[in-house]
Protein backbone atom coordinates (compact mmCIF):
# COMPACT_ATOMS: atom_id res chain seq x y z
CA UNK A 1 0.00 0.00 0.00
CA UNK A 2 2.88 2.35 0.79
CA UNK A 3 4.22 1.88 -2.74
CA UNK A 4 0.99 3.32 -4.12
CA UNK A 5 1.92 6.80 -2.87
CA UNK A 6 5.60 6.50 -3.71
CA UNK A 7 7.08 9.02 -6.14
CA UNK A 8 8.48 6.05 -8.08
CA UNK A 9 4.99 4.72 -8.76
CA UNK A 10 4.04 5.39 -12.44
CA UNK A 11 0.45 6.19 -11.47
CA UNK A 12 1.64 8.71 -8.89
CA UNK A 13 3.98 10.29 -11.45
CA UNK A 14 1.11 10.58 -13.93
CA UNK A 15 -1.15 12.21 -11.34
CA UNK A 16 1.59 14.66 -10.38
CA UNK A 17 2.16 15.54 -14.02
CA UNK A 18 -1.57 16.14 -14.53
CA UNK A 19 -1.56 18.37 -11.45
CA UNK A 20 1.38 20.35 -12.83
CA UNK A 21 -0.41 20.78 -16.17
CA UNK A 22 -3.53 22.05 -14.41
CA UNK A 23 -1.51 24.61 -12.44
CA UNK A 24 0.24 25.81 -15.60
CA UNK A 25 -3.12 25.95 -17.38
CA UNK A 26 -4.59 28.32 -14.79
CA UNK A 27 -1.45 30.50 -14.71
CA UNK A 28 -1.45 30.67 -18.50
CA UNK A 29 -5.06 31.83 -18.65
CA UNK A 30 -4.38 34.43 -15.99
CA UNK A 31 -1.42 35.80 -17.96
CA UNK A 32 -3.59 35.94 -21.11
CA UNK A 33 -6.15 38.32 -19.59
CA UNK A 34 -4.43 41.32 -21.17
CA UNK A 35 -4.88 39.95 -24.70
CA UNK A 36 -1.61 41.43 -25.96
CA UNK A 37 0.36 39.14 -23.60
CA UNK A 38 -0.95 35.87 -25.10
CA UNK A 39 2.23 35.35 -27.13
CA UNK A 40 4.48 35.83 -24.10
CA UNK A 41 2.26 33.46 -22.07
CA UNK A 42 2.63 30.82 -24.79
CA UNK A 43 6.41 31.27 -24.69
CA UNK A 44 6.20 30.73 -20.93
CA UNK A 45 4.30 27.48 -21.45
CA UNK A 46 6.91 26.21 -23.91
CA UNK A 47 9.68 27.02 -21.43
CA UNK A 48 7.83 25.13 -18.69
CA UNK A 49 7.28 22.15 -21.01
CA UNK A 50 10.99 22.03 -21.76
CA UNK A 51 11.67 21.70 -18.04
CA UNK A 52 8.88 19.13 -17.57
CA UNK A 53 10.22 16.88 -20.34
CA UNK A 54 13.85 17.13 -19.22
CA UNK A 55 14.43 14.60 -16.40
CA UNK A 56 17.73 16.27 -15.47
CA UNK A 57 16.17 19.71 -14.94
CA UNK A 58 14.67 20.16 -11.49
CA UNK A 59 13.67 23.81 -11.97
CA UNK A 60 10.24 24.77 -10.65
CA UNK A 61 7.71 24.71 -13.48
CA UNK A 62 6.09 27.91 -12.25
CA UNK A 63 9.49 29.64 -12.14
CA UNK A 64 10.27 28.33 -15.63
CA UNK A 65 6.95 29.65 -16.92
CA UNK A 66 7.53 33.16 -15.64
CA UNK A 67 11.13 33.09 -16.87
CA UNK A 68 9.90 32.30 -20.37
CA UNK A 69 7.08 34.83 -20.04
CA UNK A 70 9.51 37.57 -19.03
CA UNK A 71 12.02 36.66 -21.76
CA UNK A 72 9.35 36.70 -24.45
CA UNK A 73 7.40 39.71 -23.25
CA UNK A 74 9.13 42.13 -25.61
CA UNK A 75 10.08 40.35 -28.83
CA UNK A 76 7.38 37.65 -28.82
CA UNK A 77 4.65 40.15 -27.93
CA UNK A 78 5.72 42.38 -30.82
CA UNK A 79 6.05 39.61 -33.42
CA UNK A 80 2.98 37.70 -32.22
CA UNK A 81 0.88 40.86 -32.03
CA UNK A 82 1.77 41.93 -35.58
CA UNK A 83 1.10 38.50 -37.09
CA UNK A 84 -2.13 38.08 -35.10
CA UNK A 85 -3.36 41.45 -36.32
CA UNK A 86 -2.56 40.40 -39.88
CA UNK A 87 -4.45 37.13 -39.27
CA UNK A 88 -7.54 39.01 -38.09
CA UNK A 89 -7.37 41.37 -41.08
CA UNK A 90 -7.04 38.41 -43.44
CA UNK A 91 -9.98 36.73 -41.69
CA UNK A 92 -12.10 39.86 -42.10
CA UNK A 93 -11.07 40.20 -45.76
CA UNK A 94 -11.89 36.55 -46.38
CA UNK A 95 -15.30 36.94 -44.77
CA UNK A 96 -16.01 39.99 -46.92
CA UNK A 97 -14.68 38.31 -50.04
CA UNK A 98 -16.80 35.21 -49.54
CA UNK A 99 -20.09 36.82 -48.55
CA UNK A 100 -19.68 40.14 -50.34
CA UNK A 101 -18.08 39.13 -53.61
CA UNK A 102 -18.86 35.43 -53.84
CA UNK A 103 -15.27 34.20 -53.77
CA UNK A 104 -14.80 30.47 -53.15
CA UNK A 105 -14.51 29.64 -49.48
CA UNK A 106 -11.13 27.91 -49.82
CA UNK A 107 -9.56 31.05 -51.31
CA UNK A 108 -10.68 32.99 -48.25
CA UNK A 109 -9.77 30.31 -45.70
CA UNK A 110 -6.32 29.35 -47.02
CA UNK A 111 -4.56 32.65 -46.11
CA UNK A 112 -6.10 32.47 -42.63
CA UNK A 113 -4.79 28.92 -42.12
CA UNK A 114 -1.29 29.95 -43.28
CA UNK A 115 -1.31 32.96 -40.99
CA UNK A 116 -2.45 30.88 -38.00
CA UNK A 117 0.14 28.23 -38.89
CA UNK A 118 2.85 30.87 -38.83
CA UNK A 119 1.74 32.68 -35.67
CA UNK A 120 1.60 29.47 -33.64
CA UNK A 121 5.34 28.83 -34.11
CA UNK A 122 6.61 32.20 -32.88
CA UNK A 123 6.47 31.56 -29.10
CA UNK A 124 7.90 28.06 -29.55
CA UNK A 125 10.87 29.29 -31.57
CA UNK A 126 11.68 32.11 -29.15
CA UNK A 127 11.48 29.81 -26.13
CA UNK A 128 14.38 27.75 -27.53
CA UNK A 129 16.29 30.42 -29.44
CA UNK A 130 16.17 33.84 -27.84
CA UNK A 131 16.16 36.22 -30.79
CA UNK A 132 14.84 39.53 -32.05
CA UNK A 133 11.39 40.08 -33.53
CA UNK A 134 12.86 40.29 -37.05
CA UNK A 135 14.76 37.02 -36.58
CA UNK A 136 11.53 35.39 -35.41
CA UNK A 137 9.60 36.66 -38.43
CA UNK A 138 12.30 35.35 -40.76
CA UNK A 139 13.30 32.04 -39.18
CA UNK A 140 9.82 30.73 -38.38
CA UNK A 141 9.19 30.38 -42.12
CA UNK A 142 12.20 28.05 -42.42
CA UNK A 143 10.90 25.96 -39.52
CA UNK A 144 7.49 25.56 -41.20
CA UNK A 145 9.00 24.67 -44.58
CA UNK A 146 11.43 22.15 -43.08
CA UNK A 147 8.88 20.47 -40.77
CA UNK A 148 5.37 21.07 -42.16
CA UNK A 149 3.59 18.18 -40.41
CA UNK A 150 4.95 18.85 -36.94
CA UNK A 151 4.32 22.60 -37.15
CA UNK A 152 0.84 21.98 -38.55
CA UNK A 153 0.09 19.82 -35.52
CA UNK A 154 1.14 22.62 -33.18
CA UNK A 155 -1.04 25.04 -35.13
CA UNK A 156 -4.11 22.82 -34.71
CA UNK A 157 -3.57 22.42 -30.97
CA UNK A 158 -2.84 26.12 -30.49
CA UNK A 159 -5.88 27.48 -32.32
CA UNK A 160 -8.45 24.71 -31.69
CA UNK A 161 -10.37 26.53 -28.91
CA UNK A 162 -10.44 29.77 -30.88
CA UNK A 163 -11.54 27.92 -34.01
CA UNK A 164 -14.39 26.20 -32.16
CA UNK A 165 -15.47 29.55 -30.74
CA UNK A 166 -15.50 31.16 -34.20
CA UNK A 167 -17.42 28.20 -35.60
CA UNK A 168 -19.97 28.43 -32.77
CA UNK A 169 -20.46 32.15 -33.36
CA UNK A 170 -20.76 31.54 -37.10
CA UNK A 171 -23.44 28.86 -36.67
CA UNK A 172 -25.15 30.72 -33.84
CA UNK A 173 -24.66 27.86 -31.39
CA UNK A 174 -21.77 28.06 -28.94
CA UNK A 175 -23.31 25.60 -26.48
CA UNK A 176 -20.74 22.90 -27.29
CA UNK A 177 -17.88 25.35 -26.76
CA UNK A 178 -19.30 26.54 -23.44
CA UNK A 179 -19.97 22.96 -22.37
CA UNK A 180 -16.23 22.32 -22.65
CA UNK A 181 -15.37 25.34 -20.48
CA UNK A 182 -14.17 23.18 -17.54
CA UNK A 183 -11.66 21.52 -19.87
CA UNK A 184 -10.46 24.84 -21.30
CA UNK A 185 -10.03 26.30 -17.80
CA UNK A 186 -8.38 23.36 -16.04
CA UNK A 187 -6.43 21.19 -18.45
CA UNK A 188 -6.56 21.86 -22.19
CA UNK A 189 -3.81 24.43 -22.72
CA UNK A 190 -1.27 22.77 -20.47
CA UNK A 191 -1.87 19.41 -22.16
CA UNK A 192 -1.89 20.89 -25.66
CA UNK A 193 1.42 22.65 -25.12
CA UNK A 194 2.91 19.48 -23.69
CA UNK A 195 2.29 17.78 -27.04
CA UNK A 196 3.27 20.90 -29.00
CA UNK A 197 6.67 20.85 -27.37
CA UNK A 198 6.97 17.11 -28.03
CA UNK A 199 6.20 17.74 -31.72
CA UNK A 200 8.91 20.42 -32.02
CA UNK A 201 11.55 18.87 -29.78
CA UNK A 202 13.25 16.89 -32.55
CA UNK A 203 13.35 19.78 -35.10
CA UNK A 204 14.76 22.10 -32.43
CA UNK A 205 17.42 19.57 -31.44
CA UNK A 206 18.43 19.28 -35.10
CA UNK A 207 18.73 23.06 -35.37
CA UNK A 208 20.78 23.24 -32.17
CA UNK A 209 23.11 20.48 -33.38
CA UNK A 210 23.52 22.20 -36.75
CA UNK A 211 24.24 25.50 -35.01
CA UNK A 212 26.86 23.89 -32.76
CA UNK A 213 28.54 22.22 -35.74
CA UNK A 214 28.64 25.55 -37.57
CA UNK A 215 30.12 27.27 -34.53
CA UNK A 216 32.78 24.57 -34.15
CA UNK A 217 33.67 24.71 -37.84
CA UNK A 218 33.99 28.50 -37.65
CA UNK A 219 36.20 28.26 -34.57
CA UNK A 220 38.45 25.66 -36.24
CA UNK A 221 38.75 27.78 -39.39
CA UNK A 222 39.69 30.81 -37.31
CA UNK A 223 42.30 28.80 -35.41
CA UNK A 224 43.86 27.49 -38.63
CA UNK A 225 44.02 31.00 -40.07
CA UNK A 226 46.13 32.29 -37.17
CA UNK A 227 49.88 32.38 -37.92
CA UNK A 228 52.02 30.06 -35.87
CA UNK A 229 54.03 31.81 -33.23
CA UNK A 230 57.74 31.86 -33.94
CA UNK A 231 60.06 30.73 -31.21
CA UNK A 232 62.09 33.53 -29.72
CA UNK A 233 65.83 33.16 -30.34
CA UNK A 234 67.79 31.99 -27.33
CA UNK A 235 70.77 34.21 -26.56
Residue ranges and their predicted role:
Residues 1-108, 115-235:
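Helix-coil boundary and N-terminal low-complexity module in membrane systems
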